[in-house]
Amino acid sequence: KDFDGKKLKCCTKEGLDIHHSEEAKKDFETLKAEYEGLCKVIKDVLHKKVEKVVVGQRITDSPCVLVTSEFGWSANMERIMKAQALRDNSMTSYMLSKKIMEINARHPIISALKQKADADKSDKTVKYLIWLLFDTSLLTSGFALEEPTTFSKRIHRMIKLGLSIDEEENNDIDLPPLEETVDATDSKMEEVD
């Protein structure tokens, strides 16, 4: 696949090579070394959901993105193949390879997450944030959520956290009383002969 003497490459797959100056390459190598610990923490939390976590240079606005392996299916192809009625399940499981998470080390969310993870790797909030980032990057990268209910629970938990609502607080909602049951003797229904 060539165009005008240049090789075309899918930007949603791993191995996208963006040509930069020597100084930019050195800066990127420094960032990779600095964020290696966070990449390991994210990989440990996501475990089998991602093949690896790397510092990427393809994104500028998002905190992270999910890409597929060089020979795996893209997000759109994955969606098409899942919709096939007569699909080959053995081929599907093979081609649905694990995703690769690329983090944007220059994004403020990733920087703050790194500080929080460096302070305490076992913090529950760090784990929730990592899962939330994974789920949102699934959506922004074009993949389907595997567990939408779990995703919405994570969102609700973060909203509670943002609104300073205590997680342990008992959330008894006042429900209207149930309709009273009527005895058979007090029934006002017509009797049938």
Curated annotation (Swiss-Prot):
* Function according to Swiss-Prot or TrEMBL: Molecular chaperone that promotes the maturation, structural maintenance and proper regulation of specific target proteins involved for instance in cell cycle control and signal transduction. Undergoes a functional cycle that is linked to its ATPase activity. This cycle probably induces conformational changes in the client proteins, thereby causing their activation. Interacts dynamically with various co-chaperones that modulate its substrate recognition, ATPase cycle and chaperone function.
Q: Which GO terms describe its cellular component?
A: cytoplasm
Extract the InterPro entries matched here: HSP90_C, Hsp90_fam
Q: Alphabetically list the UniProt keywords.
A: ATP-binding, Chaperone, Cytoplasm, Nucleotide-binding, Stress response
Any one GO molecular-function label of the UniProt entry? ATP binding
Which PANTHER family has this protein been placed in? Answer: HEAT SHOCK PROTEIN 90 FAMILY MEMBER
Where does this protein have coiled-coil stretches? none
Region described as Disordered:
171-193
The record's subcellular locations are: Cytoplasm
- Family, per entry: Belongs to the heat shock protein 90 family.
Q: What is known of its domains?
A: The TPR repeat-binding motif mediates interaction with TPR repeat-containing proteins.
Subunit structure, interactors included: Homodimer.
**Keyword check for Nucleotide-binding:** yes
The UniProt entry, under Gene3D superfamilies, shows: Heat shock protein 90, C-terminal domain
Kindly provide the name given to this protein in its UniProt entry.
Answer: Heat shock 90 kDa protein homolog
Motif (TPR repeat-binding) on chain: 189-193
Protein's organism: Plasmodium falciparum (isolate Palo Alto / Uganda)
